[in-house]
């Protein structure tokens, strides 16, 4: 199963987890502190560790965390756990981040998301925010036995493969596929222009092809529309209109709706299936899918970054943004020198 490739037994990560309330349905670490990246991140001595905690009851979890880690929160802590949870659930991409926290001698940023919100994002790509993080190799530190969550995690990976294949030609390499997958959650993200280094996707994939393969190998082997030449690192996908229609029909619901919105002329109000049938026969099918992905990511990334001003506080937001801009500047200097 693809999810087995996500598990980690890292003692250091579990030591950090011990500083937080235990009621987690899922906890995972991601980013350059977990998996080596090329570019500016490769030269950071102590990169910040990124973590996400998934909780069944955000109000109860934040209440416990405020008692244990009061200093982690911005001034929103004065309004109590219910307001914090309301901000978490109702604004941005449904996740509440506390950045620039020293924990067990390590600089970390952690986000909190409700289990229900995460499952919705994994299945439907409402925001493609945390779901996008989980399309790339991560280290799962803790996960409960929820079959619903595990099925949603697996479905998210399958959706990432299908979406990427629709944007690729009939024949392509493993690396081509992994680059498309890694780029999904950055497609349309304004931070790829402001702050984040533009070559970020390549920097993520190239040093981690083995980890991407571990994550997706079983899905690629079982896909009935795909020929996976594993030893050659090459793949072929059915690009017939019938094949593409089958692929489009399995896409996450929100992505299908965005495709329908892009293609449906004013006044027609066609149903989604009719639109997908048209797109399947369109030579620009891949471009339509790419545009639809961007139309999900762009607004959610803007909303989440704006929300960060309130959840992190102005001072931390300025420091965090400066770190991001510094990474972009170092990458630019390295390219031009």
UniProtKB/Swiss-Prot annotation:
Location(s), subcellular: Mitochondrion inner membrane
Pathway the protein takes part in: Phospholipid metabolism; CDP-diacylglycerol biosynthesis; CDP-diacylglycerol from sn-glycerol 3-phosphate: step 3/3
Keyword GTP-binding part of the UniProt annotation: no
One GO MF term: phosphatidate cytidylyltransferase activity
Tissue: Brain and liver.
Catalyzed reactions: a 1,2-diacyl-sn-glycero-3-phosphate + CTP + H(+) = a CDP-1,2-diacyl-sn-glycerol + diphosphate
Domain of life: Eukaryota
E.C. number: 2.7.7.41
InterPro entries with a match to the protein in the record: Tam41
Cofactor: Mg(2+)
Cysteine-cysteine disulfides: none
Keywords: Lipid biosynthesis, Lipid metabolism, Magnesium, Membrane, Mitochondrion, Mitochondrion inner membrane, Nucleotidyltransferase, Phospholipid biosynthesis, Phospholipid metabolism, Transferase
Database matches in Pfam families: Tam41_Mmp37
Main localization category: mitochondrion
A GO CC term assigned to this protein in UniProt: mitochondrial inner membrane
GO terms of biological process kind: cardiolipin biosynthetic process; CDP-diacylglycerol biosynthetic process
Membrane topology term: Peripheral membrane protein
Protein's job: Catalyzes the conversion of phosphatidic acid (PA) to CDP-diacylglycerol (CDP-DAG), an essential intermediate in the synthesis of phosphatidylglycerol, cardiolipin and phosphatidylinositol.
Similarity field: Belongs to the TAM41 family.
Protein's recorded name: Phosphatidate cytidylyltransferase, mitochondrial
Species this protein is from: Rattus norvegicus
Gene name tied to this protein: Tamm41
């Amino acid at each position: 199963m693809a999810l087995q490739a996500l598990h980690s037994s890292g003692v250091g990560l579990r030591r950090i987890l011990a500083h937080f309330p235990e009621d987690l349905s899922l906890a995972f670490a991601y980013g350059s502190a977990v998996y080596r990246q090329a570019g500016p991140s490769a030269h950071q001595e102590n990169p910040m560790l990124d973590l996400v905690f998934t909780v069944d009851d955000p109000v109860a979890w934040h209440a416990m965390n405020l008692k244990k880690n009061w200093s982690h929160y911005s001034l929103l802590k004065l309004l109590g756990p219910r307001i914090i949870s309301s901000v978490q659930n109702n604004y941005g991409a449904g996740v509440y981040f506390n950045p620039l926290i020293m924990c067990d001698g390590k600089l970390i940023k952690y986000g909190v998301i409700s289990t229900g919100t995460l499952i919705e994002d994994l299945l439907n790509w409402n925001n493609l925010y945390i779901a996008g993080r989980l399309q790339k190799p991560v280290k799962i530190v803790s996960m409960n036995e929820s079959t619903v969550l595990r099925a949603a995690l697996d479905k998210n990976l399958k959706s990432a493969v299908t979406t990427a294949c629709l944007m690729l030609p009939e024949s392509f390499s493993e690396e081509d596929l992994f680059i498309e997958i890694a780029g999904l959650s950055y497609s349309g993200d304004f931070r790829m222009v402001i702050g984040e280094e533009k070559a970020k996707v390549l920097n993520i994939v190239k040093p981690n092809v083995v980890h991407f393969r571990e994550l997706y190998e079983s899905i690629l082997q079982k896909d009935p529309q795909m020929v996976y030449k594993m030893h050659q690192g090459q793949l072929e996908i059915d690009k017939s209109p019938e094949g593409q229609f089958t692929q489009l029909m399995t896409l996450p619901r929100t992505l299908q709706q965005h495709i329908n919105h892009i293609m449906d002329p004013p006044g027609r109000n066609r149903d989604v299936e009719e639109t997908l049938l048209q797109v399947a026969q369109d030579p620009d099918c891949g471009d339509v899918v790419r545009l639809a992905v961007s139309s999900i990511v762009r607004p959610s990334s803007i909303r989440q970054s704006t929300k960060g001003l309130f959840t992190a506080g102005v001072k931390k937001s300025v420091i965090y943004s400066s770190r991001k801009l510094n990474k972009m500047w170092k990458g630019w200097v390295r390219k031009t020198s």
